[in-house]
């Protein structure tokens, strides 16, 4: 069963077309109206009044557009949760522009990971992080605005209907990847720390863990923090802090204030390193204020800037402040011979003074805390270091006091 979620006053014809397309494929459809202006142009299964009541507001009281979008998003989220709990939602599809994209994706993000969610939007180009957040939501660019059925929109919407029909059928049949019973470990990685994290992942897998690797792209860090906060992880191997240095320099791909603190607050055992704190990430170019710095083109979409000694010291203080309150067993590994593939002897970002400022700030900031510091005379990508970190996390997770809890 597929839920069609949207504003049936402004996009009624498009939703009616999608409903008929899905029904022609034998798909049962629930049409949910989130409009607040004119009368719906197609009869919904869940009217806007029911959505408004789910948000705790009186139907017809929403005159301000911004307040209406916020309230209806809240109500739609409750409706989607209920339909999913009742077994009447195996996938959800929405179409629209900026307003409906904001409303519908907010509601979709209330559903668990694994439930098919598809948004066809004229906004699905550029920075889509406000819509996706830390969910598994899928975005499809509409090419033309969602305003009537024409030869372009018909093909795009047909593809969307066929896609959600297939995803919903798979979800309803119970064909997702089987859930395992191995403990989940969250690890962080970027291209410049891949070799070391891969070695740690292989070792943890051999030790009986299922490892979820989060790309340190901003969205990846938010997902990592959310899963840690939700109690989904048994422990973390947080080897890559690119999002932290990127936030410090105002770059592209920030993970938010919970990036370092979520696992601490959740009381998770952690083994941590400082991979990629030698750089901050930007887009295809860097701001004018940084163009005199050591800039490296990673690929056509990503440019990085080397962090200075002063910035590394500030980053060390920030990381130490976030970790200081850890009550669960926590270990911090300092790779004295480099923080990334670029920051190694002979590498373009090799800077012992800057790295030393980072290490000194961490040592000072964590003095007297429960965080154990281990120093390694190698770089962060050394497979031996990755395996040592994995073994250390395994020891923390299987310690008698932990195993008994």
Predicted regions and their residues:
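Short, acidic/small-residue loops that bind anionic groups at enzyme active sites
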Residues: 91, 103-132, 141, 212-216, ...
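Gly/Ser/Thr-rich loops at beta-strand to alpha-helix junctions
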Residues: 7-13, 90-104, 186-197, 217-219, ...
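N-terminal glycine-rich anion-binding loop in soluble enzyme alpha/beta folds
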Residues: 5-70, 121-129, 141-162, 167
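A conserved active-site cap/scaffold subdomain adjacent to cofactor or substrate pockets
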Residues: 209-272
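Glycine-rich phosphate/diphosphate-binding loop of Rossmann-like nucleotide-binding domains
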Residues: 11-20, 30, 34-46, 180-218, ...
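Short Gly/Thr/Asp-enriched flexible loops that form oxyanion-binding sites at enzyme active sites
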Residues: 94-113, 197-201, 345-351, 359
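C-terminal non-catalytic interaction/assembly regions of soluble proteins
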Residues: 3, 10-16, 21-24, 28-29, ...
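Short, glycine-/small-residue-rich phosphate/pyrophosphate-handling segment
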Residues: 112-114, 118-167, 287-291, 302-318
